[in-house]
């Protein structure tokens, strides 16, 4: 019997298909994967430790830089956790705008996913189309928050400001074009022979294994597990909206692709419902100890200026205790565990990033596959190193 030699190959950290500075040490028997050891940490910035030296409001910009493709989802999970510790109620208008922005963020993130996933496998046309559509959402981001990526728009107690005049019209014009674009993506990929051959039966992980590994989000639902925090543990008023939660059947890369496509259609559906229910009103809770004063007060009265300065420089005390809050981010369950000692800064903050947990299953999904198929598995997990390394 012929002996075989195991070859060790390094993929990354400078490799286009790893979607960031991810290094994987791969052991191969010929071209068949025997073992994968991910090496992370190249993008570590110490977000959790930095938060211990910043007030609760000053930590919000740090969360933008976790999954930098979905900044408002990061903001949302964090401010919900702090609001739970404070026990404050958020105005209905602010809740609705948060949902709209969270779903636009989901669309924006999924568009990057389908663009890069398709490009990794060789479908360049979808890459160009998806980035064209993403640009429309980026323009909305810029109009609302002043920034295209690191938005820093949500605040403890609500929003940094109300939306601009014409916001509803602009959002409707953008999302009304999306169903046609989704049809185009499906026409280019779903029945494409090369796409089907590269994704069907690839990266299989059973429902039981997916749960055991702690996988969440579209990767979990692609394995047939019907779980979505927006429906099963609702927050920000998601219980008011009607939407489908897609699940896969064959637990492979193709199923995860189909799940995300349907999720994009459902995000458009949720945004339409939220726009229909958007009512006039305040966008910040009436809690002067926590929320910033209106800008007109800051500019026109010394009391308002002092109020703003005190909150910005000293923060606000948060009752002693601990809390865990999770949201359904585009890549899965994003959770914040915050411990307060009664001061204006977190005593400890622990972030549960979905990409970090999902990456742990990469060997289970790819073992026994060809090394060329690993690119498709990485793409279907939709990882981002900003939140993995934190």
From Swiss-Prot:
Protein name: NADH-quinone oxidoreductase subunit D
Pfam families in the cross-refs: Complex1_49kDa
Subcellular location, record wording: Cell inner membrane
Subunit structure, interactors included: NDH-1 is composed of 14 different subunits. Subunits NuoB, C, D, E, F, and G constitute the peripheral sector of the complex.
Documented EC number(s): 7.1.1.-
Disulfide topology: none
Organism: Geobacter sulfurreducens (strain ATCC 51573 / DSM 12127 / PCA)
Keyword Cell division set for record: no
Signal sequence residues: none
């Amino acid at each position: 019997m012929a002996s075989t030699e195991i070859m060790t190959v390094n993929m990354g950290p400078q490799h286009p298909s790893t979607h960031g500075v991810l290094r994987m040490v791969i052991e191969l028997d010929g071209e068949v994967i025997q073992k994968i050891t991910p090496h992370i940490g190249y993008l570590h910035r110490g977000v959790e430790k930095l938060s211990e030296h910043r007030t609760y409001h000053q930590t919000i910009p740090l969360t933008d830089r976790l999954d930098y493709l979905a900044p408002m989802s990061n903001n949302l999970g964090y401010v919900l956790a702090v609001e739970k510790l404070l026990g404050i109620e958020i105005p209905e208008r602010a809740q609705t705008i948060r949902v709209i922005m969270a779903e636009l963020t989901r669309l924006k993130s999924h568009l990057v996913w389908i663009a890069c996933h398709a490009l990794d496998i060789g479908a360049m046309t979808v890459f160009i189309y998806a980035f064209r559509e993403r640009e429309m959402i980026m323009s909305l981001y810029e109009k609302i928050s002043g920034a295209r990526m690191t938005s820093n728009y949500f605040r403890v107690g609500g929003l940094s400001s109300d939306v601009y005049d014409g916001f509803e019209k602009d959002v409707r014009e953008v999302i009304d074009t999306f169903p046609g674009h989704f049809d185009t993506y499906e026409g280019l990929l779903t029945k494409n022979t090369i796409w089907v051959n590269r994704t069907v039966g690839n990266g299989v992980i059973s429902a039981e294994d997916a749960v055991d590994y702690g996988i969440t989000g579209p990767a979990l639902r692609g394995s047939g597990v019907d779980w979505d925090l927006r429906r099963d543990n609702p927050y920000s008023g998601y219980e008011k909206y009607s939407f489908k939660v897609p699940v896969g059947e064959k637990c492979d890369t193709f199923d995860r692709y189909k799940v995300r496509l349907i999720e994009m259609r459902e995000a458009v559906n949720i945004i339409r419902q939220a726009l229909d229910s958007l009512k006039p009103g305040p966008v910040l809770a009436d809690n002067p100890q926590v929320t910033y004063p209106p800008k007109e007060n800051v500019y026109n009265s010394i009391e308002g200026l002092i109020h703003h300065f005190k909150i910005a420089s000293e923060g606000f005390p948060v009752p002693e205790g601990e809390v865990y809050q999770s949201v359904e981010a585009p890549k899965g369950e994003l959770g914040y565990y915050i411990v307060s000692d009664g001061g204006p800064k977190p005593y400890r903050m622990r972030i549960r990033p979905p990409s970090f947990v999902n990456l742990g299953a990469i060997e289970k999904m790819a073992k026994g596959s060809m090394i060329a198929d690993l690119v498709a598995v990485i793409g279907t997990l939709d990882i981002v190193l900003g939140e993995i390394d934190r």
